[in-house]
Curated annotation (Swiss-Prot):
Species name: Cytophaga hutchinsonii (strain ATCC 33406 / DSM 1761 / CIP 103989 / NBRC 15051 / NCIMB 9469 / D465)
UniProt protein name: NADH-quinone oxidoreductase subunit B 1
Catalytic activity, EC: 7.1.1.-
GO molecular function, one term: NADH dehydrogenase (ubiquinone) activity
Pfam family, one: Oxidored_q6
Database matches in PROSITE patterns: COMPLEX1_20K (PS01150)
């Protein structure tokens, strides 16, 4: 007799929270959209080859932002590209996550001091969830970033406190109108 049979009897019922089930589904099916801008993109492409087999983690690359829930920004972000990155981020469905890969996208890299054309970190454009350090980071580092993102998703709650506040404010406004 297994532990579950002993605990729940013969009914075959497993008790869980909805948050746990949704988070498990989210972390088990990450669909990244790659946004490669420089030499970090080569390492990112290598990470998606069969040698590293990201499918076993549930990570399957998608070509469109509308099908993705993770954006990987890899490389030097210039001011000309900033608007495009923001637009692609806004096209992604919620919940959406961003991985910043490499020194250039994290903080401007070697161009941070004298490069007038370089954004000093992609976090000035879009909110970043995971930073992967390195110049360029190895594929193992990006895999580690995906694992950290999965841990972050596992700990998420179904409703964020700000969303609750926004709902209550909207509900109060609707009450005043009616």
């Amino acid at each position: 007799m297994s532990l579950l049979d002993h605990k729940f009897g013969q009914g075959g019922i497993v008790v869980s929270q909805l948050e746990d089930v949704l988070n498990w589904a989210r972390l088990s099916s990450l669909f990244p959209m790659s946004f490669g801008l420089a030499c970090c993109a080569i390492e990112m492409m290598q990470t998606f080859t069969s040698g590293y087999d990201l499918d076993r983690f549930g990570v399957i690359p998608r070509p469109s932002p509308r099908q993705s829930d993770v954006m990987i920004v890899a490389g030097t972000v210039t001011f000309k590209m900033a608007d495009r990155i923001r637009r692609l981020y806004e096209q992604m469905p919620e919940p959406r996550y961003v991985i910043s890969m490499g020194s250039c996208s994290n903080c401007g890299g070697p161009y941070w001091e004298h490069g007038y054309h370089v954004v000093k970190g992609v976090d000035r454009i879009v909110p970043v969830d995971i930073y992967v350090p390195g110049c360029p980071p190895r594929p193992e580092a990006l895999i580690g970033g995906f694992l950290k993102l999965q841990e972050k998703i596992r700990k998420e709650t179904l409703v964020a406190p700000k969303a609750v506040e926004r709902f209550l404010e909207t509900h109060a406004k609707e009450k005043n109108i009616a």
